[in-house]
């Protein structure tokens, strides 16, 4: 497990620039989203990744994408997965051999896997949910073998693809356009390395993906060590090693534990005193009860940060409390687009052939969320909770 002291690497050795973010939810072909993100490449220099929601939904298996430092590590670490009860049904090269001569790449493979039986999961980890078991083993693998390998996609539905190069290189290396014939429900694209130094094999590219959770982030949290401490106290493993990871894991925890969008906003983006003064007495009591929780108190995000989080059928956009990073949203009844620049949204609406009903920059510290519902997009109000009731 990564220690809190090692967690925040600062900006050492990183080129100037800013992350390019694009998140789209709706029904679309991939090429339109990829073309839309190209206008953000100037910000990013190198490091690019794509998460495609719905890529593997017909398979009914968990699919792992794993990068290895070299060929010698492959059999050794495949054996480690088997020892944890994970059955490898099929293994495939995710990258054509010719690209290993053109680019400096780790060995990249994909695996169709099944978890242990419920009885075996209970014996091994005292849990019976297959998705949770796989997530735990992925975090364990990435922590133990950080310098030798990284599982960067582990979903039954989504596929994540990362490189240390530009977006067009990522598309080429993985032959992303081979998936063009289908329609997809959501897509996240991130350009540039994160601002924390990180550790391990090809640590930098995003989206960071774990099970059905994926996220992208622009900025740098000054609160990352406190955020990491909160996750550590909850027993949630940090397994990639950048500040961005905290945002996504905190969002996942808060949604899973049935906090409303408004409460999540209170936790991660604290109100200014004058805003608290304007709250009615009951709301003020709720607010202080939540933010005075000793663990939730550490989840406050400080510093410049905008992020997009995809969790199951929910896509959420976060802005920092002081609006230190640009963030824009466009939408109609069929599509929701979030990006680090308005022109990426306009580009997406053009390539998607969609006329947007709204195009705006959210207020500082606001969370905006949408639910994907059979190709339609529903904006969620602040009272929304995963389980419906408090």
Residue locations for each model-derived region?
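Conserved short alpha-helical segments that host acidic/polar catalytic motifs at enzyme active sites
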Residues: 1-390
């Amino acid at each position: 497990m990564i220690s809190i002291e090692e967690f925040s690497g600062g900006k050492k050795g990183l080129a100037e620039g800013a992350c390019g973010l694009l998140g789209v939810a709706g029904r679309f072909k991939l090429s339109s989203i990829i073309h839309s993100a190209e206008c953000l490449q100037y910000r990013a220099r190198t490091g690019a990744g794509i998460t495609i929601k719905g890529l593997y939904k017909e398979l009914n298996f968990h699919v792992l994408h794993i990068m290895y430092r070299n060929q010698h590590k492959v059999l050794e670490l495949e054996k480690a997965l088997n020892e944890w009860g994970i059955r490898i049904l099929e293994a495939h090269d995710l990258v054509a051999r010719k690209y290993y001569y053109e680019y400096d790449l780790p060995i990249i493979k994909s695996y169709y896997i099944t978890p242990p039986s419920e009885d075996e999961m209970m014996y091994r980890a005292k849990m019976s949910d297959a998705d949770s078991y796989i997530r735990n083993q992925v975090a364990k693998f990435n922590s133990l073998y950080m310098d030798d390998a990284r599982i960067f996609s582990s979903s039954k539905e989504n596929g994540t693809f990362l490189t240390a190069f530009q977006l067009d290189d990522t598309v080429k290396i993985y032959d992303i356009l081979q998936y063009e014939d289908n329609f997809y429900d959501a897509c996240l694209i991130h350009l540039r390395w994160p601002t924390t130094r990180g550790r391990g094999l090809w640590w930098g590219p995003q989206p960071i993906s774990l099970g059905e959770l994926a996220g992208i982030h622009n900025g740098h949290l000054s609160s990352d060590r406190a955020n990491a401490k909160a996750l550590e106290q909850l027993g949630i493993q940090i397994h990639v090693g950048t500040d961005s990871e905290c945002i996504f894991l905190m969002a996942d925890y808060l949604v899973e534990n049935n906090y409303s969008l408004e409460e999540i906003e209170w936790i991660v983006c604290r109100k200014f005193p004058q805003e608290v003064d304007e709250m009615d007495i009951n709301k003020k009591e709720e607010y202080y009860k939540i933010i005075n929780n000793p663990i939730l108190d550490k989840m406050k995000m400080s510093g410049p940060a905008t992020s997009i989080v995809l969790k199951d059928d929910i896509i959420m956009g976060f802005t920092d409390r002081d609006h230190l990073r640009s963030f824009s949203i466009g939408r109609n009844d069929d599509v929701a687009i979030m990006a680090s620049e308005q022109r990426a949204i306009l580009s997406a609406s053009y390539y998607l052939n969609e006329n947007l009903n709204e195009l705006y920059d959210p207020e500082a510290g606001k969370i905006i969320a949408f639910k994907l519902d059979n190709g339609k997009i529903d904006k969620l109000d602040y009272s929304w909770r995963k389980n419906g009731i408090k």
